[in-house]
Amino acid sequence: EPGTPEGFRQLRAARDCLLAQGAVLLAPCPHQKPCPLPSDDWCHFTCRIARSRLHRQLKGADAPYEDEKFCYLAFGRSASNRAVSRVLRHPQIESGRITLRLCTRSGLITLPVRKRDGSLFKSARKASSGDAFPFEG
């Protein structure tokens, strides 16, 4: 679906309906609970797509790419491959610290990760919006 508030609203309704019927949600949510996002926010991710020469001409654009927003749901038969948490926004990078907005099995959290956190900091440096992240909150 398009990564718009309306696209997310429709997916959220479908999510609630499928979960009520016993479906197993695999992604992007790391849990089967109700979505913890407030009604004025929406879960969306970004994918960079290459533009053809014709596409650039039609759009009057100079950049050879376009950042497309989307939202999605993935269901499966078992929860064995479900992420522990998911990065919801682009990480905020500061000197010696990275702040992540995560959806975890226990809800939404803002996680500051410092250099002294070792392997967690290394994972945070590589993290992008939409990635699974190895943190149980």
Say what each PLM segment does.
Residues 30-43:
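Conserved catalytic loop of SAM-dependent methyltransferase domains
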Residues 5, 32, 79-81:
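Short, solvent-exposed loop/turn segments at secondary-structure junctions
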Residues 23-33, 51-57:
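Conserved S-adenosyl-L-methionine
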Residues 45-137:
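C-terminal lobe and adjacent flexible extensions of AdoMet/dcAdoMet transferase-like proteins
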Residues 1-6, 24-28:
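Conserved beta-strand signature within the Rossmann-like core of class I S-adenosyl-L-methionine
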